[in-house]
Swiss-Prot record:
More about this protein: The basic functional RuBisCO is composed of a large chain homodimer in a 'head-to-tail' conformation. In form I RuBisCO this homodimer is arranged in a barrel-like tetramer with the small subunits forming a tetrameric 'cap' on each end of the 'barrel'.
Annotated positions of the N6-carboxylysine modification: 191
Localization of this protein: Plastid, Chloroplast
BP-aspect Gene Ontology terms: photorespiration; reductive pentose-phosphate cycle
Record protein name field: Ribulose bisphosphate carboxylase large chain
Length: 465
């Protein structure tokens, strides 16, 4: 029997509504917007084909392998409520399509060429189910939440951070001075801005040295373990590891990486180095909005968060929720749980399309940062709980009396909120009152309350279910 050449509909091979998914399959939920005249089944099947074994025409080499064993399958399609001509297409991928321990390879297949496919007007990857059989091939975060708490000897409260501003232009010595003031005032961490790498006004080695001096001085004065996220992101992997090695030689606890601009291969290499050498790894998500902001095209952040948990990181930025709409709060808390918890049930109201079981992969601390200040502290404490990092950049450095009083104000506000919560008070209802009470005995907090009492960031939610 000769092989039959020609073009045939994808749905004849790749749309299989009777397929029962296997425990080892990687499952994907795509939001598909077909071109006019393309039926949803054909669009869903095209996604399955182009992200696995298919191409646009029948090829004779198909006969040299078992397509049934290796092909992706679109096994279910449902219309998106309230949207015209949008569908959720569920696709199952056999595990053997992917290299073990490689987020890079997984994404190259699942979100590769298929996103430029002409039969689709738009395509968004909403969620991925990573099976234990695949996640066990990854190291995951270098240390995880519990090990980090033990290293820092800090329990029972969120951790406090601050991004040093202005983000660009400070000399290394002035940068170190700003770090020292913040840590002395009561913060647990300070942070390199994501754009700070090794520029002419501040080379990385100078910054690392002045920062280490600030760290040891602040630790000696406060009796607490302190950290500064030293950004090791660089133009090459070799240079990145060189910076991490120098950080380790200085004896500091944590380094940082921009995982999307740096790339998953570099990130996974750095995560392995950090575990082997006892360094915590803070992850910034610069560039995420390019990928996840459009609601009908791209990749949802919950997928990027899962990918980071596989690739490795101990902290990752995760938005703030505060001052946004309720719908966004549920979606944000959905991926915060996917970062922290071992087992997360499917819950479409929070945007979670699949039950996710992480088995032995450690959890990641979500970092709330961006436009937050002391008046937000009760809401942040309630929403994110103890296992989080609350990061106030302008909300520390913008204090009228300087960095250290700004840090004091944040620490006092946090301790007051944690104590009130532990006493059974309702932070959502009594939050402002709790902050006012605390400001009576902390002049630093009173000054912060006064300067930021009118500031609000209220916009429509971009991300809806």
């Amino acid at each position: 029997v000769g092989f039959k050449a020609g073009v045939k509909d994808y749905k004849l091979t790749y749309y299989t509504p009777d397929y029962e998914t296997l425990d080892t399959d990687i499952l994907a939920a795509f939001r598909v917007t077909p071109q006019p005249g393309v039926p949803p089944e054909e669009a869903g099947a095209a996604v399955a084909a182009e992200s696995s074994t298919g191409t646009w025409t029948t090829v004779w080499t198909d006969g040299l392998t078992s397509l049934d064993r290796y092909k992706g399958r679109c096994y279910h399609i449902e219309p998106v409520a309230g949207e015209e001509n949008q569908y959720i297409a569920y696709v199952a991928y056999p595990l053997d399509l992917f290299e073990e321990g490689s987020v890079t390879n997984m994404f190259t297949s699942i979100v590769g060429n298929v996103f430029g496919f002409k039969a689709l007007r738009a395509l968004r990857l909403e969620d991925l189910r990573i099976p234990p059989a695949y996640s066990k091939t990854f190291q995951g975060p270098p240390h995880g939440i519990q090990v980090e708490r033990d290293k820092l000897n800090k329990y029972g409260r969120p951790l406090l951070g601050c991004t040093i501003k202005p983000k660009l232009g400070l000399s290394a010595k002035n940068y170190g001075r700003a770090v020292y003031e913040c840590l002395r005032g009561g913060l647990d961490f300070t942070k390199d801005d994501e754009n700070v790498n090794s520029q002419p006004f501040m080379r990385w080695r100078d910054r690392f040295v002045f920062f280490a001096e600030a760290l040891y001085k602040a630790q000696a004065e406060t009796g607490e373990i302190k950290g500064h996220y030293l950004n090791a992101t660089a133009g090459t992997c070799e240079e990145m590891i060189k910076r991490a090695v120098f950080a380790r030689e200085l004896g500091v606890p944590i380094v940082m990486h921009d995982y999307l601009t740096g790339g998953f291969t570099a990130n996974t290499s750095l995560a392995h180095y950090c575990r082997d050498n006892g360094l915590l790894l803070h992850i910034h998500r610069a560039m995420h909005a390019v990928i996840d902001r459009q609601k009908n095209h791209g990749i949802h952040f919950r997928v990027l968060a899962k990918a980071l948990r596989l690739s490795g990181g101990d902290h990752i930025h995760a938005g703030t929720v505060v001052g946004k709409l309720e719908g966004e709060r549920d979606i944000t808390l959905g991926f915060v749980d996917l970062l922290r918890d071992d087992y997360v049930e499917k819950d479409r109201s929070r945007g979670i399309y699949f039950t996710q079981f992480w088995v032995s992969i450690p959890g990641v601390l979500p970092v709330a940062s961006g436009g937050i200040h002391v008046w937000h502290m009760p809401a942040l404490t309630e929403i994110f709980g103890d296992d989080s990092v609350l990061q106030f950049g302008g909300g520390t450095l913008g204090h009228p009396w300087g960095n250290a009083p700004g840090a004091v104000a944040n620490r006092v506000a946090l301790e007051a909120c944690v104590q009130a919560r532990n006493e059974g008070r309702d932070l959502a209802r009594e939050g402002n009152e709790i902050i006012r009470e605390a400001s009576k005995w902390s002049t630093e907090l009173a000054a912060a309350c006064e300067i930021w009492k009118e500031i609000k960031f209220v916009f429509e939610a971009m991300d809806t279910l």
